[in-house]
Amino acid sequence: ALLVMLISGVIPMSMILYFSVHDSFAGNNFIWVGMNWFQQLLSSSDFYGAFFRSLGFSALIISIEIPLGIYIALRLPQKGFLSNLYIVLISLPLLIPSIVVGHIWKFLTLPKIGLISSSIDYLGVSYDMNNPIIVWITLALMDSWHWTSLVILLCFAGLKNIPEAYYQAALVDGASGWSVFKNVQLPKLKLVLLIAILLRFIDSFIIYTEAYVLTRGGPGVSTTFLSHELVQTATIQFDLGEGGAMSVIYSLVVLCVSWVFFSLIVRRNNGQ
């Protein structure tokens, strides 16, 4: 396990840190530049634009998938054959690779022949993938279709762990459905929801494959997220120094958010 961690984590991160404070020229020649790459990034409008687009996309995804996942989980039967069948069907989108999801939605939104675009055009509404708003809506729908299942499964598992005695007590008190949700189910789901929000933030913040296949970062730079900037810088332009610095900042953001949520999860688990 230690060897796997070393190969998959420590060594790549060490190389990224090395690249982030060096500049390369004439092949494998590196010179020390200190924090120059970081200063250049933190004064770049392109970097800030991509960064805030990534944050905005994560916020949009969480605001859609968490409430939707809770609602669907509440509507599912807790026992019986139908319960098992629904869980299997709901899990299917999670089994589809990201690149396949991107191509599926690319085909669905093709002008004139795509199922989504032609259906909306039939209603008299223009479905133009050159419109940034339409593209963002499409990306949100695609991600929600792919990943809301994860939130549903987590919430469903959390609901199944609520003792029946809580529901019986609420029934005796004459509590309404909303009251049961607010005072019984939601408090018991807080730990699960923290985990769900963390997982969905990380995955949506680093989204690359589906978005790139569907939009190529366009129209313009409207869907050019930080992951696209990183790939463009490090692998297309082969600018290892700037790419390394961007990777470090990227990783620090994810680590800081993960630490905050991990602290909340530990506190919640300890009953604080």
Question: Where in the sequence are the language-model features?
Answer:
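A structural signal for multi-pass alpha-helical bundles of membrane permease subunits
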Residues: A1-Q272
